[in-house]
């Protein structure tokens, strides 16, 4: 790796990142959609394939997770207008937000209460389908609800699934795998919250805890799976299937925007702010949105000031060859879902030509935003899920991106979507603690 001093000279923004200051980085490598898609390792066909697979499984999902009955086994979340929060942001940050503000509530996705219910559940279902088809338990024409049988559960019990996680991916993989009958092990990093470990164990999942961070948990999970031919490893750092499971969100969102009569075109730009850990969730969603809205959607990743792994990987072009710890950042944050020191090289390289930018936000800010959203809209998210909330303020305030893309005149007709990535499964006492922290920090600030 280039010497750190050389990197700092080449990328002056690194100095601010090292000081854990909040920054906004505009991606100089973003290309027009038509150019970017030509070199992409994934295509619209891949996303369609994932969408069809989820449809095939819908009857099974509706049967085994009654909370999805109403949506006929489709795992989806509400898209809500949040005008009171918008007013509060404008007042608190003394910055007008041009355009409408909405919250995509993946925090309230059924089954596992986070964005990871998309990619995680999808990858487990795909693996189950492959095994069942190979062994004649299923044909693609069958009603997949037949998988809810003792015979199928006994069959899947011969196989195991492993994953490394800071929490939410572990929940979605663990809950789904256990429901199908797989033996499942979740390797959890030091920052994983206790209640997430407890919940998994209550579902019959084997949880292994590590003193080290996320990368170590993934490494150990991979090692265990390599030693056991019947074990399938969900590789959060490199998985195309996870990525595609997230990408399906885009066409669902398109339908919701149409229902709300919100237009997205050249005169009506769409901005989407996505909390980013290793990169799979936000990368997949952003990729799906780019396929649909091309140059009319502008996607920004949001990371904690203490874990800006994707920003550093993208900015330096080193991707997964650099970790935040290499430049003296500690990767310690209360935004547990985003506490990742080394980004996914696959996601970074795939998204580099599509992504508008990336910004960082402090833990203190996340807590204040958590309290504000609860007060104004009565919506409770976990700290990491608030990372996107400051995005519209940042992009409108530091308007270099808007100027560069000649969007200033179009902003009044634009739409901002903050992706709320998790929170509905947080136990009440834990959420009260988050709220109180936000309250104390708000008083301090004033």
From Swiss-Prot:
InterPro entries tied to this protein: D_Ser_am_lyase (IPR011780), Ser/Thr_Dehydratase (IPR050147), Ser/Thr_deHydtase_PyrdxlP-BS (IPR000634), TrpB-like_PALP (IPR001926), TrpB-like_PALP_sf (IPR036052)
Protein name: Probable D-serine dehydratase
Reaction catalyzed: D-serine = pyruvate + NH4(+)
EC number of the protein: 4.3.1.18
Modified residues (N6-(pyridoxal phosphate)lysine): 116
Pfam families, A to Z: PALP
Domain of life: Bacteria
Cofactors that this protein relies on: pyridoxal 5'-phosphate
Gene: dsdA
Family: Belongs to the serine/threonine dehydratase family. DsdA subfamily.
One of the GO BP terms on file: isoleucine biosynthetic process
MF GO annotations: D-serine ammonia-lyase activity; hydro-lyase activity; pyridoxal phosphate binding
Record's keyword terms, sorted: Lyase, Pyridoxal phosphate
PANTHER family: D-SERINE DEHYDRATASE, THREONINE DEHYDRATASE, MITOCHONDRIAL-RELATED
């Amino acid at each position: 790796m280039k010497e750190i001093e050389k990197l700092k000279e080449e990328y002056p923004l690194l100095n601010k990142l090292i000081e854990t200051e909040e920054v906004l980085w505009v991606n100089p490598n973003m290309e027009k959609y038509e150019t970017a898609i030509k070199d992409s390792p994934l295509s619209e066909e891949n996303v369609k394939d994932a969408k069809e697979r989820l449809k095939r499984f819908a009857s099974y999902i509706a049967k085994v997770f009654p909370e999805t009955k109403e949506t006929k086994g489709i795992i989806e979340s509400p898209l809500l207008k949040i005008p009171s929060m918008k007013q509060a942001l404008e007042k608190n940050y003394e910055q007008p937000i041009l355009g409408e503000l909405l919250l995509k509530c993946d925090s309230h996705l059924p089954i596992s209460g986070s964005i990871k219910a998309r990619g995680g559940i999808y990858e487990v279902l795909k693996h189950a389908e492959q095994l069942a088809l190979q062994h004649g338990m299923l044909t693609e024409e069958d009603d997949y609800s037949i998988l809810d049988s003792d015979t199928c559960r006994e069959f899947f019990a011969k196989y195991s699934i492993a994953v490394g996680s800071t929490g939410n991916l572990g929940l979605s993989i663990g809950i789904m795998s256990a429901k199908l009958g797989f033996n499942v092990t979740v390797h959890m990093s030091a920052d994983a919250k206790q209640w997430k470990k407890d919940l998994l164990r209550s579902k019959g999942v084997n949880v292994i805890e590590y003193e080290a961070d996320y990368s170590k948990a993934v490494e150990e999970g991979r090692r265990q799976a390599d030693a056991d031919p019947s074990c399938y490893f969900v590789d959060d750092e490199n998985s195309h299937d996870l990525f595609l499971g997230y990408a399906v969100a885009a066409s669902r969102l398109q339908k919701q925007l149409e229902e709300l009569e919100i237009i997205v075109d050249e005169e009506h730009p769409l901005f989407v702010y996505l909390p980013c850990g290793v990169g799979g969730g936000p990368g997949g969603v952003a990729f799906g949105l780019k396929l649909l809205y091309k140059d009319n959607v502008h996607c920004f990743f949001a990371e904690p000031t203490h874990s800006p792994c994707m920003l550093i990987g993208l900015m330096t072009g080193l991707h997964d060859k650099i970790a935040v710890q290499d430049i003296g950042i500690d990767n310690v944050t209360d935004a547990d879902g985003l506490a990742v020191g080394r980004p996914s090289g696959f996601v970074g390289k795939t998204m580099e030509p599509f992504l508008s930018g990336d910004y960082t936000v402090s833990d203190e800010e996340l807590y204040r935003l958590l309290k504000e959203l609860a007060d104004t809209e009565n919506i409770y998210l976990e700290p990491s899920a608030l990372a996107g909330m400051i995005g519209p303020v940042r992009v409108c305030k530091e308007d270099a991106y808007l100027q560069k893309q000649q969007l200033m005149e179009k902003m009044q007709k634009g739409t901002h979507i903050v992706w709320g990535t998790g929170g509905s499964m947080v136990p009440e006492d834990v959420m009260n603690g988050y709220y109180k922290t936000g309250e104390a920090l708000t008083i301090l600030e004033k």
